[in-house]
């Protein structure tokens, strides 16, 4: 039997995140040499990563990080295969570390984030791959949002009490209003608007909605003379449903979100809603 101590096993577990039996086996095969055991476990872990590539990662968590002065914020989704891993401390620590890295480096997009160095000589992609190996599940990082402005608010929603947040919303206002920011963010979490305003809806989407409205109206046998007005009404209904500013406000359905903002003298600059797996 190789010559090593319980302290060596503990050290190896801390260095690699591997289980106790795997660490003992690696030390046996490495004749008690911790460095060689680390290398062997990492090679084994990378083989496991390759095997997990074809698996689906639809569970996970959304994490957030807001600056103390609330002028900047990060929202990040990290996915895994099971809710068991998602609610574990190790997985959530990885997610929070990644969010802190985004806050510190402000990557332009997901490609830039994955290619950036989170530690000396280690990219974010390599860091995620290590988490994949250590946690024994496919771990995926492919989405984040980062806002900087006059005031940034966040709302995190748990769909199950024993799981980490599955929905996160980031909002940017042109002035500080914590209560309004929270209310708007909660509304976004619940109603999932696709766009901020009419102006943000792509022209091709509007045209597609208009064509559907025309075909539906004709199929209903409506008079041709009434067609333009009916179609316009249906397109306006689409805008009301799909745009945040057009939706009835969740906390006061008699007012639109735009009306609530106008009454508060606040402009909502942008928002981001992330739901795990969607």
Swiss-Prot record:
The keyword Protein biosynthesis applies. It comes from the Bacteria. Keywords: Cytoplasm, Elongation factor, Protein biosynthesis. Its main location: cytoplasm. GO terms for molecular function: translation elongation factor activity. Residues 82-85 are annotated as: Involved in Mg(2+) ion dislocation from EF-Tu. It is found in: Cytoplasm. GO terms for cellular component: cytoplasm. CDD domains: UBA_EF-Ts. InterPro entries: EF-Ts_dimer_sf, Transl_elong_EFTs/EF1B, Transl_elong_EFTs/EF1B_dimer, Transl_elong_Ts_CS, UBA-like_sf. Belongs to the EF-Ts family. Associates with the EF-Tu.GDP complex and induces the exchange of GDP to GTP. It remains bound to the aminoacyl-tRNA.EF-Tu.GTP complex up to the GTP hydrolysis stage on the ribosome. This is Elongation factor Ts. The lineage of its organism: Bacteria, Bacillati, Actinomycetota, Actinomycetes, Kitasatosporales. The gene is tsf.
């Amino acid at each position: 039997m190789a010559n090593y101590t319980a302290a060596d096993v503990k050290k190896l577990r801390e260095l690699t995140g591997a289980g106790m039996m795997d660490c003992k086996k690696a030390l046996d095969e490495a004749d008690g040499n911790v460095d060689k055991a680390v290398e062997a476990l990492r090679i084994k872990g990378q083989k496991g990563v390759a095997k997990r590539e074809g698996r689906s990662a639809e569970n996970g968590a959304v994490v957030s990080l807001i600056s103390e002065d609330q002028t900047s914020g990060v929202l990040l989704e990290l996915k895994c295969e099971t809710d068991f891993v998602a609610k574990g401390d190790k997985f959530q620590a990885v997610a929070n570390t990644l969010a802190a890295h985004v806050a510190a480096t402000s990557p332009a997009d997901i490609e830039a984030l994955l290619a950036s160095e989170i530690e000396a000589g280690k990219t974010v992609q390599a860091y995620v791959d290590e988490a994949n190996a250590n946690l024994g599940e496919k771990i995926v990082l492919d989405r984040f949002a980062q806002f900087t402005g006059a005031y940034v608010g966040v709302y995190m929603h748990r769909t199950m009490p024993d799981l980490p947040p599955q929905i996160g919303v980031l909002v940017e206002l042109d002035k500080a209003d914590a209560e309004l920011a929270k209310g708007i963010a909660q509304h976004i979490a619940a109603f999932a608007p696709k766009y901020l305003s009419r102006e943000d809806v792509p022209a091709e989407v509007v045209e597609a909605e208009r064509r559907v409205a025309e075909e539906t109206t004709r199929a209903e046998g409506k008079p041709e003379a009434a067609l333009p007005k009916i179609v316009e009404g249906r397109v306006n209904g689409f805008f009301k449903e799909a745009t945040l500013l057009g939706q009835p406000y969740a906390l006061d359905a008699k007012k639109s979100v735009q009306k609530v903002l106008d009454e508060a003298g606040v402009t909502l600059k942008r928002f981001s809603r992330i739901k795990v797996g969607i």
